[in-house]
């Protein structure tokens, strides 16, 4: 039975005590826009590096394409996103799940993913839509991402240089598990489609050793009203993690929640721009 009603997740299992330790550093209205396209913004964040060798490394983070079919808007979104990514040419590119609505669009998205900068190490996680769309099985999604140049992480990790990326399964539809061990000598980057997923698995060790959490799913609310902000977030914690940069008071862990690139079943955005996020470790 679905726990989502009017864009809010009313799941019984919540970790309110873990949520209290997080504070918002920057909101939607405080975002730093590096470049503004016709449809997509490139927003920037600077995150403290735990190790000197990590300083200066760049990550492009994007999520929630939700593409429905070949049309001029979607082609323009991909074109602007590709231009931004090529200009930055980052060390890492990460995708946060919820790819398409219809299987017929997969070739277009694959071509886009394959066109991203070749030198960048690329990873992805699954979203709830990858489970809802039953025309592709789990192994097919892995093959799709591999053919696109991305490594799919489902409760698993991969290491590049001084970084360890850990990707979770989807909290709502999958079987989410945390890592068995968390090393001390790596820059730990957690990839979770929904911010709720990291809250779900973040015990003290994970929290203290993680440098950065990257999430999407909320679409920044997709429809934001003056003085109210996001109305619908599909989060168990409603607007707590709707968008922006968050820091944990206890562990100094950073979390970035993106507004995404597409739309949910409601094909409308109001005062909530599509975005790619550029994260630089400093």
Q: How would you name each of these model-derived features?
A:
Residues 70-160:
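Core catalytic region of metal-dependent phosphoesterases/phosphodiesterases
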Residues 60, 94, 123, 189, ...:
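Hydrophobic "anchor" residues on beta-strands that sit immediately upstream
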Residues 49-52, 66-68, 128-212, 218, ...:
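Conserved catalytic scaffold of divalent metal-dependent phosphoesterases
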Residues 5-112:
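N-terminal active-site segment of His-dependent metallophosphoesterases
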Residues 1-42, 247-282:
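Acidic, His/Gly-rich catalytic cores of divalent-metal-dependent hydrolytic chemistry
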Residues 220-225:
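His/Asp/Glu-enriched short active-site or ligand-binding loop at hydrolase and phosphoryl-transfer sites
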Residues 226-231:
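Membrane-interfacial alpha-helical segments at the cytosolic side of multi-pass membrane proteins
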């Amino acid at each position: 039975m679905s726990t989502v009603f009017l864009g809010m997740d009313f799941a019984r299992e919540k970790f309110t005590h873990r949520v209290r330790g997080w504070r918002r550093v920057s909101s939607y209205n405080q975002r730093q826009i590096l470049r503004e396209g016709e449809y997509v913004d490139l927003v920037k964040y600077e995150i403290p590096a735990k190790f000197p060798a990590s300083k200066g490394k760049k990550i492009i983070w994007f999520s929630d394409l939700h593409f429905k079919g070949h049309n001029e808007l979607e082609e323009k979104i991909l074109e602007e996103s590709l231009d931004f990514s090529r200009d930055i040419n980052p060390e890492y590119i990460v995708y946060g799940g919820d790819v398409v609505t219809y299987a017929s669009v997969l070739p277009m998205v694959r071509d886009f993913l394959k066109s991203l900068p070749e030198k960048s190490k690329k990873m992805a996680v699954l979203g709830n839509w990858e489970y809802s769309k039953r025309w592709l099985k789990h192994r097919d999604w892995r093959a799709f991402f591999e053919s696109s140049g991305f490594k799919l992480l489902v409760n698993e990790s991969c290491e590049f240089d001084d970084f360890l990326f850990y990707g979770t399964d989807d909290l709502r539809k999958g079987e989410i598990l945390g890592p068995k061990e968390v090393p001390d000598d790596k820059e730990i980057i957690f990839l979770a489609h929904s911010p709720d997923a990291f809250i779900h698995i973040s015990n003290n060790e994970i929290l203290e050793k993680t440098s950065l959490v990257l999430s999407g799913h909320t679409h920044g609310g997709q429809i934001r009203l003056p003085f109210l902000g996001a109305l619908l977030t599909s989060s168990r914690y409603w607007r707590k993690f709707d968008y922006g940069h968050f820091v944990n008071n206890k562990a100094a862990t950073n979390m970035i929640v993106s507004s995404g690139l597409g739309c949910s079943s409601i094909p409308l955005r109001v005062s909530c721009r599509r975005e790619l996020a550029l994260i630089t470790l400093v």
